[in-house]
C-alpha cells in the first residue's frame, strides 16, 4: 500500500487556522471610526452645535447604530 492521505480517495479538510484569520478579519472594521458614517456624523454634529447634546439624542443614537453596523464597538 502507498501512503495516501485517506484510503477512500478524499482529501482531509484543511486546518482551522485560515478560517480563524478570516473570521477575525470580518469582525474588524474596514474603516477608521472618524471616516465611518459621514452622513449621520454630520447631522449629529450640526444638531449638537445648534441645539445642545440633550436635544440631539435621536441623531446621536442613529450615529451609534451606524457605527455598530460598520463593526465598531460603541
From Swiss-Prot:
Sequence motif: Cx9C motif 1, positions: 37-47
Stretches for region Disordered: 1-30
Positions of disulphide bridges: 37-66, 47-56
Keyword Disulfide bond: yes
Taxonomy, superkingdom: Eukaryota
Matching InterPro entries: Cys_alpha_HP_mot_SF, Cyt_c_oxidase_Cu-chaperone
Pfam family, one: COX17
Positions that bind Cu cation: 34-35
Domain CHCH: 34-74
Main location: mitochondrion
Any GO MF annotation of the entry: copper chaperone activity
GO cellular component, one term: mitochondrial intermembrane space
Induction statement: By copper, salicylic acid (SA), nitric oxide (NO) and infection with P.syringae pv. tomato.
Gene Ontology biological-process entries: response to bacterium; response to copper ion
Motif (Cx9C motif 2): 56-66
Keywords of the record: Chaperone, Copper, Disulfide bond, Metal-binding, Mitochondrion
Keyword check for Glycoprotein: no
Protein location: Mitochondrion intermembrane space
Known function: Copper chaperone for cytochrome c oxidase (COX). Binds 2 copper ions and delivers them to the Cu(A) site of COX. Can complement the yeast mutant cox17.
Stated family: Belongs to the COX17 family.
PANTHER family to which the protein is assigned, alphabetical: CYTOCHROME C OXIDASE COPPER CHAPERONE, CYTOCHROME C OXIDASE COPPER CHAPERONE 1
Protein name: Cytochrome c oxidase copper chaperone 1
Species the sequence originates in: Arabidopsis thaliana
Amino acid at each position: 500500500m502507498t501512503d495516501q492521505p485517506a484510503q477512500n480517495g478524499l482529501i482531509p479538510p484543511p486546518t482551522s487556522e485560515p478560517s480563524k484569520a478570516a473570521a477575525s478579519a470580518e469582525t474588524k472594521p474596514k474603516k477608521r471610526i472618524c471616516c465611518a458614517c459621514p452622513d449621520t456624523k454630520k447631522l449629529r454634529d450640526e444638531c449638537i452645535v445648534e441645539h445642545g447634546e440633550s436635544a440631539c439624542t435621536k441623531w446621536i443614537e442613529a450615529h451609534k447604530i451606524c457605527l455598530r453596523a460598520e463593526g465598531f464597538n460603541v
